[in-house]
Amino acid sequence: FYHIDFSFDDLRLGGSAFAQSLNKVGSDVPICKNPEYFRDAFDAVQTLVNKGLVLAGHDISAGGLITTLLEMCFANMEGGMEISLDKFGRHDIVKILLAENPGVVVQIADKHKAEFKKIMDDAGVGYLKLGHPTDERLIQVTKDGAEYQFGIDYLRDVWYSTSYLLDRKQSMNGRAKARFENYKMQPLEMVFN
């Protein structure tokens, strides 16, 4: 897994879902400091996709990096991730996990690692190696020797229970409960032509 930053900005919590959960908005919001860099990062990711190098990917937006990682795992019924945040440097873990600076996380097969790095380096786009998939149904995050574990299935239940409560109020067909009771039994299968 690799983190590709589109903002070229410091990690900021203003305007984030995290700030809102604390009844704040904040004025220190992430911006895109360099539009040309943003374009180059976007184009580099498109090259990766067009060459078939991306096994999985997700944008970093509402909820930040931790939400991105969780959402990448929610659709699967097996496996997790081992993630190291040490390459983010001196940033605190709250900002690393919850800042909503524009970017993406992509999964690249080991056999394509050199080609991935060449494409990114040739485009002048920064990236950080985050980690790799695991068999265990957890996202294990380490930073400066501290370890944090996020139970994917538990957090998926929390996530979907909120969606269910909203669906129950919005759905006119009375099927919200059936959808909620069934969501775990629908593994995601995709075929691309």
Go through each PLM region and give its residues.
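Intein/HINT protein-splicing elements and their conserved insertion hotspots or analogous self-processing inserts
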Residues: 1-98, 109-193
